[in-house]
Amino acid sequence: MYPADIEKDAVNWKDAQGQHVTAVRRNILVLGSGGREHALAWKLAQSDGAVVYIALGNAGTAQVGINVNIKLSDFKAIKDFCIKQEIHLVVVGPEQPLVDGIVDFFKEDADLRGVKIIGPDRRGAQLEGSKAYAKDFMEKYGVPTAKCFKVNKDNLDEGYKFLESVNAPYVLKADGLAAGKGVLILNDLQEAKKELGKMLDGKFGAASATVVIEEFLKGIEVSVFVLTDGEHYVLLPEAKDYKRIGDGDTGLNTGGMGAVSPVPFCTPDFLDKVEQRIVKPTLKGLKAEGIDYRGFIFLGLMNDNGNPYVIEYNVRMGDPETEAVMTRIEGDFADLLDACADGRLNEVHYAKSNKTAVTVMLVSGGYPEAYKKGMVMSGLDLLKDVVAFHAGTTFDADNNVVTSGGRVIAVTAHGESIEEARGVAYREAEKIRFEGVNYRHDIGLDLMKMQ
């Protein structure tokens, strides 16, 4: 997108009226390679003077920035790249580098002091990295959540007793990160006890050495996104995602098969409850713990008869929710993240579109179980009135776009209503072809009844 010999301190282009414009160049590095990172890069590339690099990126991010072949676990290589390319801002997409301490690495290295980074340090990332820690935090600071019991091999009998004390279904959560697969919801008590034993025996490796047993919360789930500089915050557009592989919320859990934003039941009254009961106590708690948190907080909430409860904290944006949310954020997103990193979010104007975004995720045949990779994709050049965010794509030797993951591409459309937006999204999704392509046909249908 940008030539290698681009001026070092400025970016030049013509605006919509053909006027020559010059802006201070801002080199931005987005870490990650999925649909979330494509959406972040897509939005950041619209900022004045932005030159966006993505590590590792995918076939879609190559259209909005420059892909860089650096592993997310190689902090030294990331540092060297930031220095060489004079990176101004780093945006961390996935949770693993945050839990592994990439923000601490940046803060502690004198050579990187001029580089801003969006995300919490290792302590802050424990809100997602350890469900037991998150539960203790919520209890300590009065954040509403489900009743729970933390169990390991030393108190297994007490864990069994807790299971017997609550009603089905039974919720078992691996304490640590388990690639989104560490939560089991079971209807049979004996099966729950059996699976609890398997988890403690290493079903999810070290992640399930401790298991959090939770009382099941009934209601409708919603994802609420907060951007905070530690003192101030803004609520980004909320979204509802669809976890199950099949229509009608049937079949296996996935990373997410689609999203809708905004969510009809997230009224001003409901969101005020979220702020007063959850966001403000969470930020107060982080400050009390001495955690300087500058980044995203993704609140996985349950709406139980108009009352919000926290199911989980995440310390980054959601996927596929980001693919819907980013299309509704107005203004210069890099300015917003700059202000976040600088501790001056209160000084920046933030606005969001009133239109509805619907995202439909196309996945590989067989996903979320075994699937093929390398399937040639077609129809991408036929798309109109949508943004297609690549999740699992790459280029083959002949420069064809091919599949490289279970979740392949997210098609996002806007409309005045859910019905209008989903109509466009599905119309365009049908144009994308590859062997085994699969997607849900009911994204947003449940919410249309509420709108």
Model-based region annotation:
Residues Y2-P120:
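ATP-binding N-terminal substructure of ATP-dependent carboxylate-amine bond-forming enzymes
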Residues G18, L29-V30, G114-V115, G129-V211, ...:
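Active-site nucleotide/adenylate-binding loops and adjacent lid/helix of ATP-dependent enzymes
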